[in-house]
Amino acid sequence: MAASSEVSIDPDQWFYIYSLERVAYVCERVGSPVMEEAELRRRRRKRPFLTTTHDELELQMEDLVDELYGVDEQGSSSAAARKRRLTAEQVRALERSFEEEKRKLEPERKSELARRLGIAPRQVAVWFQNRRARWKTKQLELDFDRLRAAHDELLAGRTALAADNESLRSQVILLTEKLQANGKSPSPSPAPAEQTAVPAAPESAKSFQLEEGRRLYDAAGSTTTTNGGGGGVAMPAARVAAARAASNDSPESYFAGARSPPSSSEDDCGGAGSDDDYPSSSVLLPVDATLVGDAFEHAVAATVAADEEAPLNSWEWFWN
């Protein structure tokens, strides 16, 4: 009974079993390319977003599509129920449809594309979603390149402006040193608004006075004036008028139409004599005509000096 239960194993079978165990052990310790590829695919399915290369990204997308469509509409999971990959013609048709309208895929459009291409509507939706994500990424790259080019252009312009500024600054320093070497200190020129004009009133008043005196002197003839002794002296009427104006130095003479207060001959002459003994002030003139001329010239010189000290009021006061 015990002998019948024993299983006899051929030596060749023992070698075959040993070889299988040895191969399994070696594969487990070292790893074969087939086992490594299978393990890599298994890990990628568990962690589909840890890789970064383009090929691995495409492989991840394919694995995701396979996982999405691994279950058919009846809910049975099998390898035969997985959807087929898109052909080149189907991809071109989907690309043309995407170029026409990049917005969200409408249900009617999705159903029409799926019916025309012979694929499931869900597969069309997934393809459009992935294609739209790639398009947005491409647009971001284009925008980044455009902004980077604009930044580089602005930076180049700033560098050029800085170089021009430095060149102008060096020229200013060089010119300043040359001016200092020549003994001319650079001073800013005053603004036109700050420059004060010298008033021309004194010159005009002086010219007017001289011209008026010359005109009166040339136009007037020689008149005869008499003194208290009865002697006649020929002298210009202009000088006589100037002498009278100089002798009339009362405050009332400065105001037009003013009347002088009454005065008696006693106050003027100290109570001695009468008007007959002393001639009136209108004929009290020097005998010598040269003295009258000197008095006139002295009055004109005093007026000019007063005009220089008070340029705005002296000539008006004199001629009033």
Swiss-Prot record:
Signal peptide: none
A GO biological process held by the record: positive regulation of DNA-templated transcription
Principal location listed in the UniProt entry: nucleus
Subcellular location: Nucleus
Keywords: DNA-binding, Homeobox, Nucleus, Transcription, Transcription regulation
The keyword Transcription is assigned to this record: yes
Record's keyword annotation contains Nucleus: yes
GO molecular function terms listed in the Swiss-Prot or TrEMBL record: DNA-binding transcription factor activity, RNA polymerase II-specific; sequence-specific DNA binding
Entry superkingdom: Eukaryota
Positions with biased composition (Acidic residues): 265-278
Tissue: Expressed in roots, leaf sheaths and blades and panicles.
Region (Disordered): 181-209, 249-282
Leucine-zipper: annotated segments: 138-182
Cited PROSITE patterns: HOMEOBOX_1, HOMEOBOX_2
DNA-binding region: 79-139
Gene Ontology CC: nucleus
Reported function: Probable transcription factor.
Similarity comment: Belongs to the HD-ZIP homeobox family. Class I subfamily.
Protein name from the UniProt record: Homeobox-leucine zipper protein HOX25
Species in which this protein is naturally found: Oryza sativa subsp. japonica
Gene behind the chain: HOX25
